[in-house]
Every structure is written in structure tokens, then in C-alpha cells.
A protein has these predicted regions:
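ABC ATP-binding cassette signature C-motif
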Residues: 1-263, 311-312, 316-577
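Intracellular alpha-helical coupling/juxtamembrane segments of multi-pass membrane proteins
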Residues: 251-276, 280-300, 304-306
Length: 577
């Protein structure tokens, strides 16, 4: 479908990657991985035809359509949600308009026996059959399925897109892209603005899709569930594995060990050669051999080793005083903005040492309850913070509180105490501030970089109760592993607001579900909760489809039927008639 040959991209004089070649085939589900700045988003832009490589060729098979979802895009505010989603079916509307004109012409004409009239009937029949095959009569149902799958309520369909946040408008763009059903989908961080239910829906959609998918994501569970091939960009090269991400991690570790052995052998060879040259440089009897060794040394191509895997780095929180038995107790807590009730009658008790997750669709009040606990906003009811509780709070706006005039290294050096100061550079590297990045001033950092720095700073402060609101948003998978292990070893209490299943798995032992103005407690881990939710949804479906009330459901044609060839569909229609 797409062939990439000899690709090279340079920024200034430094190549981002070079001599990159691979092929994207139908049904490929490719995870494009690598550290931040390796060139993943650049690769997607090149595949989408939005950026030209310095060298090389991207050949797209004739007739192949490509759909691209960037991390950031310009969004329209002039239409309703439904009208915006309908833009994916412009070709249907064009066909509909054409059919209406042809139909009107047939109605106006009276030369029923003429050859041109019969030709018009044939053209109309042909176009009408194409229109039906392309979903001309059921496109609206497809839009509704996609929008609800991505978390919209039916009451949202007629609301203007300007009423929605940037994250929700990105969902509309994703819906339009999926509805167009391109042959190749290029997705850059598609789960960034999705909740768990929407992520699971997207997973199922992509797995059922007949085209190819190339995606960049830091959601490990998502890429494991969707992909069957992993392409890593590392040290300016690519490594192509025909396996899902978890298996790739194992193979990558083996590859790095082999590289390390080869590197050590090469270094020994270089040292031995240099020693020989130095020892016999001024001996006339060895002149030929010395010159030979010098040429040999010049021909050696240095072996590069992949970036060090920082996931084995262990962080330990500094000691803090022991808190009371119940760090947080909520009694009949309610929060409303005017007539809009976010939640009501919230009753929960979090015990010392518990690690709990707040989950639910966006806008259901997870971050709002966190702000109530932090006493940042007023609320109704009673909310008690326990004895000796020292809260460490992370939210995206915490990054704004950093001192802009100091470096990344100094920001962390100011809070680090004891032996941990010897590991500052390792810690910074684990959170993608390796090398020269640690000497950058805070004021030149991007929003995502500032968030990561605020997270590191929090990890080194002595607290006994952590509240983390979307802590993994700007972390790569290795950074998330480091953070997760640190939290697992933390002996205090933790509340995590997150949609990242892989991050929550094995970390939390209780889940609070936000939805419909209520907060429900579920004992167990995130996958226990999701399994229970799946069963509840099935039970609700069975109840709503009980024999007494269920109406017979018209079976929808399978996707493969809707994509039959024109002649085959024509024959099928004859048989039906």
C-alpha cells in the first residue's frame, strides 16, 4: 500500500533519521515507538504527505486513501457536532444531489421511447446502486454509532462545537476521520483526550477495520491490544519487529545486550590497535604494520548503542510523618455550577495506605472532586482531611508554579535530599531530560516538559498523601514505568485520576466510578472494574431486550457485504427483487 525507500530527514546538519526503508501492507497494525524527539510525529507527517523528506521516496499505491490525525489541529467552530461529523460524507451528499437532478430530469422529460431517455435511466440506476452500496441511506446511523462510541450523548449532536473543550473537539475530528474509512490510518496520540470506555471502543473499531493503521501512542494497553507490528526509531535508524509491543520490549532488550557486547569488543579492538601504533610508531622495522593498523583504525565504523533503558531505575520517596487512619472522608458532598449538578451525595472514606483510582467520562467530576479535596473550590456537604496529612498534588497547572529563571537540574537539586542527589541526572534522564536538556532554563520548556519537571519535583518531596490528576499525559512508556514502580513502593495514600489502564493495573486496589452525578465504589483493580462493567452492560442490554418488550431487530449487512463489487451487488439485488 505504501512503500518507504531510503528516507532521510535532516534538521540543520543533524540527521533525525536516515536510510529508512519499510513497507506498509494491508491489515498492518503498526506501533511507531521511540523516545520523545526520535522523529515519530515527523514520520507520520511524511507518510501523510504533509512534510517532505531530505532524501528518499514515499510511494503510495494508486487509489489508496490516507487519513491523518495529528496531536494538534485547527478546529472549526461554525457547525453543530452532527453537521461537523457529516462532513465525512461529502461524497454521499454530492451523489445525492446528482441523483436528485437526474430524477428531476426523468420527471420533466416525456420522450420515454428515445435512446437518450433509456441511457439516462441506466445512468440513474447505476448511480443509485452505487449510492446504496456506499451507505447512502444509513450514514446517519453510522455517525451516531461513532459519536456515541467516542463518548458523546445524543443530546450533544445538535450543540455547536464551540461549546466543547479542545479535547472534545479533537474527538469530533477523530470521528470524522474514522467515518471516512481511509485505507491507511495515521494516528498521533489518538487516546490523549479519551476516557477508558472510548479508548476500548476505538480499540475494537481499529481491530475490525479492514485497512492499515500506523499509530504513535504512550498508552501501552492500547497499542498492545491494537497492533501486530512494532517499528522503533532509535539512533537515526529503524528496527522493524513483526510483533506487538510487549514482545518487542523483550526482543529490544536482547538486541541492546548484543549491541553492548559488540561495542565492548570493538572498544577492545580499538584500544589494542592504538596501543600497537603507539608502541611501534618510531620503529622502522614495524613501519608497514603501523601504517596498516592506522588504515584499519580509520575504517572502523563506531557501533552505536540504543538509548539506555531507564525503566529499571528505582525511585524512593523521602520519608514523611505517618498520617491518620483516614486521610479523606467525604460525607454527602455535592458540587453544582448553577443548575448543573456535577455530583451529589458523595460518601467515601479512603484509608491510610490505600491507592485508589478516579475514573469516568470526561466532565463527570473527577478533577472537580480533587479540587474540593484540595479546598480550591467551594462545595456542599462535609469533607474531612485526616490528622498529619501532608498532600503532594499534581495537576497540569502545577507546572505554572515552577521558577522560570533556573535550570531543569537546579529545579530538582533544590528539593533533592541525601543520597538521591547523586541520582539526579539518572532521574532526569528517566523522565526525558537527558544530556543537555537538564541545563535548559525552565522558561524555554514546552508545556509537556514543564509538567514532567513538576512531576519529578513532587516525587522528591516528603509527603504521605499523593493526589495525581492525569500524571501520565506527557510521559513516555519508560517514564511511566519508573513512576508506577515508585508509587507502588510509596507507603502513603494515593488518589490517581487517569484513563491509562496499563498504568493503573497492579497499582490501585479500589476504583471510584464517576457518572450521572454519582460516585460508585468498586473494590479491586482496574481490570476487575472493567470486567464488572462489561457484565453490567450485558445485563442492562438483556433487560432492555427482554422477550416481553424487545422488538425484532433488523439485521445489518456485514461490512464485507457492503463492499461487494458493483456487478456482484447488482446480481444480489436482482435475486432479492
Amino acid at each position: 500500500m505504501i512503500s518507504i525507500e531510503g528516507l532521510k530527514v535532516e534538521f540543520g546538519t543533524t540527521p533525525l533519521f536516515e536510510d529508512v526503508s519499510f513497507v506498509i501492507n494491508k491489515k498492518d497494525r503498526i506501533a511507531l515507538v521511540g523516545k520523545n524527539g526520535a522523529g515519530k510525529s515527523t514520520m507520520l507527517k511524511i507518510l501523510a504527505g504533509l512534510q517532505q523528506p531530505t532524501e528518499g521516496v514515499v510511494a503510495v499505491q494508486r487509489g489508496i486513501t490516507i487519513g491523518y490525525l495529528p496531536q494538534v489541529m485547527i478546529l472549526s467552530d461554525t457547525r453543530t457536532v452532527m453537521a461537523e461529523a457529516e462532513m465525512a460524507f461529502e461524497h454521499i451528499f454530492e451523489m445525492q444531489e446528482k441523483l436528485e437532478k437526474m430524477n428531476q430530469e426523468l420527471a420533466d422529460r416525456t420522450d420515454y421511447d428515445s435512446e437518450s431517455y433509456h441511457e439516462l435511466i441506466e445512468r440513474f440506476t447505476h448511480e443509485n446502486e452505487r449510492f446504496l452500496m456506499m451507505g447512502g441511506t444509513n450514514y446517519r446511523a453510522e455517525i451516531e454509532r461513532t459519536l456515541t462510541g467516542l463518548g458523546f450523548n445524543r443530546t450533544d449532536f445538535d450543540r455547536p462545537t464551540s461549546e466543547f473543550s479542545g479535547g472534545w473537539r479533537m474527538r469530533i475530528e477523530l470521528a470524522k476521520l474514522l467515518l471516512r474509512r481511509p485505507d491507511v490510518l495515521l494516528l498521533d496520540e489518538p487516546t490523549n483526550h479519551l476516557d477508558i470506555e472510548s479508548i476500548q471502543w476505538l480499540e475494537n473499531f481499529l481491530k475490525m477495520s479492514s485497512g492499515a493503521v500506523v499509530l504513535v501512542s504512550h498508552d501501552r494497553a492500547f497499542i498492545n491490544n491494537v497492533t501486530n507490528r512494532t517499528i522503533e526509531i532509535s539512533c537515526g535508524r529503524i528496527y522493524d519487529y513483526k510483533v506487538a509491543y510487549d514482545e518487542f520490549v523483550v526482543l529490544r532488550k536482547e538486541r541492546r545486550e548484543q549491541q553492548l557486547r559488540a561495542y565492548e569488543n570493538q572498544q577492545k579492538e580499538i584500544k589494542d590497535t592504538e596501543d600497537f601504533i603507539e608502541r611501534f610508531r618510531y620503529k622502522a622495522t614495524k613501519a608497514v604494520q603501523v601504517q596498516s593498523r592506522i588504515k584499519q583504525l580509520e575504517k572502523i565504523v563506531p557501533i552505536e548503542i540504543d538509548e539506555e533503558d531507564t525503566s529499571t531505575l528505582r525511585l524512593k520517596f523521602p520519608p514523611s510523618m505517618r498520617s491518620g487512619n483516614y486521610p479523606v472522608i467525604c460525607e454527602n458532598v455535592k458540587k453544582a455550577y448553577g443548575d448543573h449538578v456535577v455530583f451529589h451525595d458523595v460518601n467515601l472514606t479512603i484509608h491510610r495506605g490505600e491507592k485508589v483510582a478516579f475514573v469516568g467520562k470526561n466532565g463527570e467530576g473527577k478533577s472537580t472532586l480533587v479540587k474540593c479535596i484540595m479546598d480550591e473550590i467551594p462545595y456542599e456537604g462535609k469533607l474531612t482531611i485526616g490528622h498529619n496529612v501532608q498532600i503532594g498534588y499534581f495537576a497540569q497547572n502545577q507546572a505554572q508554579l515552577l521558577d522560570e529563571n533556573v535550570t531543569v537540574f537546579d529545579t530538582i537539586d533544590r528539593v533533592a535530599k541525601g543520597d538521591i542527589r547523586l541520582k539526579i541526572r539518572d532521574i532526569l534522564g528517566a523522565f526525558m531530560f537527558g544530556g543537555e536538556a537538564s541545563e535548559k532554563k525552565v522558561k524555554v520548556l514546552s508545556g509537556g516538559e514543564r509538567s514532567r519537571l513538576a512531576m519529578i519535583k513532587l516525587l522528591l518531596e516528603p509527603v504521605n498523601f499523593l493526589i495525581l490528576d492525569e500524571p501520565t499525559n506527557h510521559l513516555d512508556m519508560r517514564s511511566k514505568d519508573v513512576l508506577k514502580e515508585a508509587l507502588k513502593e510509596f507507603d502513603g495514600t494515593v488518589i490517581v485520576v487517569s484513563h491509562d489502564r496499563e498504568f493503573l493495573d497492579g497499582l490501585v486496589t479500589k476504583v471510584y466510578e464517576f457518572g450521572g452525578g454519582l460516585v460508585k465504589e468498586h473494590i479491586g483493580g482496574i481490570y476487575d472494574f472493567l470486567q464488572k462493567k462489561k457484565m453490567e452492560n450485558l445485563n442492562e442490554l438483556q433487560l432492555s431486550q427482554s422477550p416481553q418488550t424487545a422488538s425484532p431487530k433488523k439485521e445489518e449487512p456485514a461490512e464485507s457485504e457492503s463492499k461487494l463489487s458493483y456487478e456482484a451487488q447488482k446480481e444480489l439485488n436482482k435475486k432479492i427483487r
